[in-house]
Each structure stands twice: as structure tokens, then as C-alpha cells.
């Protein structure tokens, strides 16, 4: 498809996923502005631009609802050719819905947001399993982090800490620390493949960075859709009960006024 009608963003974007991720939904960018401000870009793949309502592909995606992960098996929501066409793989300019956030460098407070439909060329697909052990709080705080996009990662981590602090004040309790999310990883192919159990530290710098940017995007777009009367799929939580609905509501567990499912369009 020809997406040349959409402007090409002037950013150096990068994504952070596992090495076996084929559906790269999101990426980020950082541009330092004059006057002590920084513009954060949260770039989300936009496969809906190439899918017509009620055509066969739309019906398949709606029937599957999400990508299914199982040990040794992954069934994707979208067919492989469509994933390859819209995945934010490095070196390709693909259509994105971008949320730009202007942030004060001193306080890390959000001054304004802007949403654009554009093309984004991802410079690098970074991988958790390659750099997660290197990206520590100690390395960030001491200025010794030595990975690609180190400056951007350090800045975004500090911004993410501010976003997390704001949410914790709303929800009235801190995020749990030290939790490990366990998952199955397939190494090799065919009958000789090995299934290994691996863990990811919740709250580790890279995990925190990605999680907070996605929560912020989903919260911002949820409020935006509500203001404009646009239908959406919302996740809310009141009195401990989590609901999925087309009616917006607060999410007490996350500490946000609205939370729309917007940031994983290739997978759900």
C-alpha cells in the first residue's frame, strides 16, 4: 500500500520487545526542545488504515479477538502478511498513530499532548533479553548506561517514574515491587525445540518505561474519545471489579480516570 499521503515524522524512534516478538505494536522517541522542554513520542501501529469494516480480514480479526500464546504455539490475530505490512520493524516507514507529549524537563510534568496520524521509521528494535540486565537503576543514576539509545532510555525512565508517582497518589498505594512475571519461551524449532521457563522483573527500568508510556497513552486517548463522543473499548475498575465496556469509567487499580485499549492493535 502507498502511505505517502501521511507525513514522515522527524524522529529517531525505537521499540523494546522480546527477540521472538513479530508483532511490534509500539515505539517511542525523544526530542529535546528549547526552553527546557522535551517532546516524547509514543508511536502505535495503525493496521486499521488498511482494513475495511466487515471485509474478510476484519471478520477474522474480530473472531480471533487477540493473538494466542501457548508453549510452542502462537496463533496471531492478523495473518502474517498484514503483520509484516504494519509491524514497526526497524528501517521501514509505516503508518502510526502518534501521541506527542510536551514535558517540562525540571518537573517532568505534562504540559500538553497532540495526536497525529503519520509515518514513522523505527531506527532500532531493541530487545529485552539482550539489554534488560544492562539497564539498571544504578547505571541510569550514575550516567554509566552503555546501550544504544541510552540517553533516551534514561530520560524516559525518569519521566516514567513521575507518571508512576502520580498514579500511586491517585490510587492511594504504591505499585508492588520485586514481582516476577514468568512465561514460556520456545528455543529452536520442530521436535527438537526446547521450552524454557523465563522471568521478567516487574518494575525493572525497561519494564517500567514501556508500561508507563502505554498506560499514559491509553488513558489520554480514553479521555480524548470520551470528550469527542467517539466509541471505544474501555477497561475500568471500581470496588475491585474489572470490567470491559464501551462506556468509559475510572480505573481505580491503575489510578487513571479512563483507560482505553489502544496500544496493541496488531495483537488484540
PLM segments and residue spans:
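Electropositive polyanion-binding surfaces
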Residues: 1-268
Amino acid at each position: 500500500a502507498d502511505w505517502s499521503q501521511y507525513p514522515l515524522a522527524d524522529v529517531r524512534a525505537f521499540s523494546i520487545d522480546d527477540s521472538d516478538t513479530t508483532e511490534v505494536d509500539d515505539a517511542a522517541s525523544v526530542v529535546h526542545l528549547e526552553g527546557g522542554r522535551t517532546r516524547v513520542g509514543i508511536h502505535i501501529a495503525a493496521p486499521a488504515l488498511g482494513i475495511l469494516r466487515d471485509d474478510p480480514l476484519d471478520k477474522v480479526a474480530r473472531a480471533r479477538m487477540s493473538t494466542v500464546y501457548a508453549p510452542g504455539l502462537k496463533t496471531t490475530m492478523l495473518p502474517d502478511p498484514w503483520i509484516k505490512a504494519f509491524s514497526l520493524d526497524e528501517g521501514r516507514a509505516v503508518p502510526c498513530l502518534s501521541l506527542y507529549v510536551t514535558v517540562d524537563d525540571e518537573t517532568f510534568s505534562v504540559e500538553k499532548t497532540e495526536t497525529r496520524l503519520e509515518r514513522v521509521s523505527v531506527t532500532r528494535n531493541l530487545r529485552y533479553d539482550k539489554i534488560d540486565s544492562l539497564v539498571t537503576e544504578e547505571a541510569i543514576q550514575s550516567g554509566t548506561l552503555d546501550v544504544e539509545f541510552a540517553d533516551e532510555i534514561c530520560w524516559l525512565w525518569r519521566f516514567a517514574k513521575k507518571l508512576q508517582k502520580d498514579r500511586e497518589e491517585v490510587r492511594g498505594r504504591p505499585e508492588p515491587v520485586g514481582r516476577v512475571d514468568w512465561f514460556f519461551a520456545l528455543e529452536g524449532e520442530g521436535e527438537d525445540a526446547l521450552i524454557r521457563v523465563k522471568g521478567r522483573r516487574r518494575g525493572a527500568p525497561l519494564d517500567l518505561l514501556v508500561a508507563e508510556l502505554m498506560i499514559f497513552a491509553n488513558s489520554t486517548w480514553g479521555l480524548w474519545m470520551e470528550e469527542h463522543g467517539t466509541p471505544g473499548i474501555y477497561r475500568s475498575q471500581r470496588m475491585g471489579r474489572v470490567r470491559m465496556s464501551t462506556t468509559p469509567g475510572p480505573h481505580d487499580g491503575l489510578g487513571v480516570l479512563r483507560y482505553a485499549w489502544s496500544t496493541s492493535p496488531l495483537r488484540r
